[in-house]
């Protein structure tokens, strides 16, 4: 599809499923190229299935890079036959269909769905979502020295810190490329000149070359060279005077100066050079200039002549030209000045400008460093904090010692470098999926208890109990936890026994709020005129519990004070029910298991 802009139909009447799949993949590719050609986003969701969506995006992105698709060729995508539309989607049961649970990329391995992210993103801890990778902080960018890294969503870009300067242009790869003014026609050479490109500039070379003894000026005119003014190579020998002519020069003998005189530079007359060493007629700060028959004193560069004191005084360039000589700081010196920079900057090669120092290149921070203009900033990873002492060292945060540390873990918090861990008691509990709470292990459900076949397993917080009971004499078992009294047959002692004994199991932690109702007792069906009395007849030696009536025919057992430590209690509660002039007794055996609080 990328090369031919159309899809070939499967050949033969018995075209294989593979050929049919290839053609369907081809149509998905053409849809991606069509989206790019029509200016649509390559991330557009067509609800065509995960595999087709991946091919759609890949061909759309590639078409953006090549830009060679003719929209008219996309008409072929409309020619999918009804037979193809009726074929069963081979990826109907694909859990990645439509993207599945993943935010970006999804792959169904058969055993599980694996999510992944596009380049420039990283998978979050939920295993589904993706977040942008900050390549500028992680150091995974490719920016060169002199370039700043700027993070973008899914990628980054490099930006040159300084401009290229006159005569250069910035390329797409942040390089400085010389501008050929001659080729681009932006030079200012006159018609009599030929433009010749140089690095960062150009020069105009005259088309007409001058003869020996002449030099061309800026307008390509030939100007006579005064050979006699050459200081490097004097054309005439000592004792002769040089006389310039058009295109050349001549020489003649010089006069013979008397004692105490010297021939001047022109060789025309004799003069005394009062400025010649070791004589210093002008004094400190002056420059002596010889003249015919005399001399004059001038101030050196960096000094000016004070008409009042008649002396050369130092020029304070920093005050005379404020902010124009130096980029940061200007310090005056005798006859000159010196530029310096603020902290975090260094002096450029021109001796005047200041450029930022990248302090991060020397790794001053213990973890992360970010260079800023004129300084730098240290950062710490999650679980660490910057030291208040030096501002560069990252110290571990003891999450367990924070004011909220007691609420981080339900049982015990253990600090580790950069994070913390929660733990549970050695037995009876396991750590919840959130990594903070402790969940009770129901040994009775999981089958890890050691109760015998004649015992009943009862789960409590952090453990379990094996319970078994037998009905006392003159009673028979009527339910799993209930005993009924046998007929008494005129036996008075027997008639005083409770009609029913029922066993109950209760469990609560030591930190339960008191007072608290833990058990309610009354007849299963009340009759008008019923009344009752409730009393604890055993197991309350320490006075943790009490009874009270809440209605004429029902009462409750309440906890009056917290049980200070884990323990097992057996409480016997007796209810006397008065009905139609007779009294019937009922007993409740309460197995109470007090567990430790987390």
Curated annotation (Swiss-Prot):
GO terms for molecular function: calcium ion binding; peptidase activator activity. CDD domains: ANATO, EGF_CA. InterPro entries: Anaphylatoxin/fibulin (IPR000020), cEGF (IPR026823), ECM_structural_protein (IPR050751), EGF-like_Ca-bd_dom (IPR001881), EGF-like_dom (IPR000742), EGF-type_Asp/Asn_hydroxyl_site (IPR000152), EGF_Ca-bd_CS (IPR018097), Fibulin-1 (IPR017048). The gene is FBLN1. Homomultimerizes and interacts with various extracellular matrix components. Interacts with FBLN7. Interacts with the mature/soluble form of DTR. Interacts with CCN3. Belongs to the fibulin family. Keywords: Calcium, Disulfide bond, EGF-like domain, Extracellular matrix, Glycoprotein, Repeat, Secreted. Residues 1-27, 28-60 form the Anaphylatoxin-like domain. Residues 271-355 are annotated as: Self-association and FN1-binding. Incorporated into fibronectin-containing matrix fibers. May play a role in cell adhesion and migration along protein fibers within the extracellular matrix (ECM). Could be important for certain developmental processes and contribute to the supramolecular organization of ECM architecture, in particular to those of basement membranes. May serve to anchor the mature/soluble form of DTR to its fibers as it migrates through the extracellular matrix. The direct physical association with DTR may be useful in such tissue developmental processes as wound healing. This is Fibulin-1. Disulfide bonds join 1-25, 7-26, 28-52, 29-59, 42-60, 96-106, 102-115, 117-130, 136-149, 143-158, 164-176, 182-195, 189-204, 210-222, 228-242, 257-270, 275-288, 282-297, 299-312, 318-330, 326-339, 341-354, 360-369, 365-378, 380-394, 400-413, 409-422, 424-438, 444-457, 451-466, 471-483. It comes from Chlorocebus aethiops (Green monkey). Gene3D superfamilies: Laminin.
């Amino acid at each position: 599809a990328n090369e031919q802009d159309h899809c070939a139909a499967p050949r033969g009447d018995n075209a294989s499923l593979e050929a049919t799949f290839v053609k369907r993949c081809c149509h998905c590719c053409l849809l991606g190229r069509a989206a790019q050609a029509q200016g649509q986003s390559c991330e557009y969701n067509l609800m065509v299935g995960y595999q087709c969506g991946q091919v759609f995006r890949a061909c759309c992105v590639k078409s953006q890079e090549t830009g060679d698709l003719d929209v008219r060729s996309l008409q072929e995508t409309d020619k999918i036959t009804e037979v193809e539309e009726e074929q069963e989607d081979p990826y109907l049961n694909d859990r990645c269909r439509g993207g599945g649970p993943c935010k970006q990329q999804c792959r169904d391995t058969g055993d599980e769905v694996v999510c992944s992210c596009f380049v420039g993103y990283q998978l979050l801890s939920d295993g589904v979502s993706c977040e942008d990778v900050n390549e500028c902080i992680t150091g995974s960018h490719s920016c060169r020295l002199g370039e700043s890294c700027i993070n973008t969503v899914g990628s980054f870009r490099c930006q040159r810190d300084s401009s290229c300067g006159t005569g250069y242009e910035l390329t797409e790869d942040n390089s400085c490329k010389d501008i050929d003014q001659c080729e681009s026609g932006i030079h200012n050479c006159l018609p009599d000149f030929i433009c010749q490109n140089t690095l960062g500039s150009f020069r105009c070379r005259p088309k007409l070359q001058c003869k020996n003894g002449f030099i061309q000026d800026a307008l390509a005119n030939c100007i006579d060279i005064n050979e006699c003014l050459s200081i490097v190579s004097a054309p005439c020998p000592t004792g002769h005077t040089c006389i310039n002519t058009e295109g050349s020069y001549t020489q003649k003998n010089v006069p013979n100066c008397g004692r105490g005189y010297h021939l001047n530079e022109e060789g025309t007359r004799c003069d005394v050079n009062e400025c010649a060493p070791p004589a210093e007629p002008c004094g400190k700060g002056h420059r002596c200039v010889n003249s015919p028959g005399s001399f004059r004193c001038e101030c050196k560069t960096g000094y000016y002549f004070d008409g009042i004191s008649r002396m050369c005084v130092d020029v304070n360039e920093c005050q005379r030209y404020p902010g124009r000589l130096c980029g940061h700081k200007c310090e005056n010196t005798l006859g000159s000045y010196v530029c310096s920079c603020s902290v975090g900057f260094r002096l450029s090669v021109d001796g005047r400008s200041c450029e930022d120092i990248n302090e991060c290149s020397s790794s001053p921070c213990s973890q992360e460093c970010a260079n800023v203009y004129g300084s730098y900033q240290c950062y710490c990873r999650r679980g660490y904090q910057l030291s208040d002492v030096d501002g560069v060292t990252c110290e571990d945060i003891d999450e367990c010692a924070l004011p909220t540390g007691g609420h981080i873990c339900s049982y015990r918090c253990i600090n580790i470098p950069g994070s913390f861990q929660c733990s549970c008691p050695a037995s009876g509990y396991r750590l919840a999926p959130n990594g903070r709470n402790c969940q009770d292990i129901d040994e009775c459900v999981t089958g890890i208890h050691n109760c015998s076949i004649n015992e009943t397993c009862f789960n409590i917080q952090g453990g379990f109990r094996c319970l078994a009971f037998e009905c006392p004499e003159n009673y028979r078992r009527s339910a799993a936890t209930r005993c009924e009294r046998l007929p008494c047959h005129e036996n008075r002692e027997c008639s005083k026994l409770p009609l029913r004994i029922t066993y109950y199991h209760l469990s609560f932690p030591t930190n339960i709020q008191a007072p608290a109702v833990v058990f309610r007792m009354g007849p299963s069906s009340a009759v008008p005129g019923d009344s009752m009395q409730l009393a604890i007849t055993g197991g309350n030696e320490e006075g943790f519990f009490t009874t009270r009536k809440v209605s004429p025919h029902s009462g409750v057992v309440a906890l009056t004070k917290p049980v200070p430590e884990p323990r097992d209690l057996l409480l016997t509660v007796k209810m006397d029910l008065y009905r139609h002039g007779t009294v019937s007794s009922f007993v409740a055996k309460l197995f109470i298991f007090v567990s430790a609080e987390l």
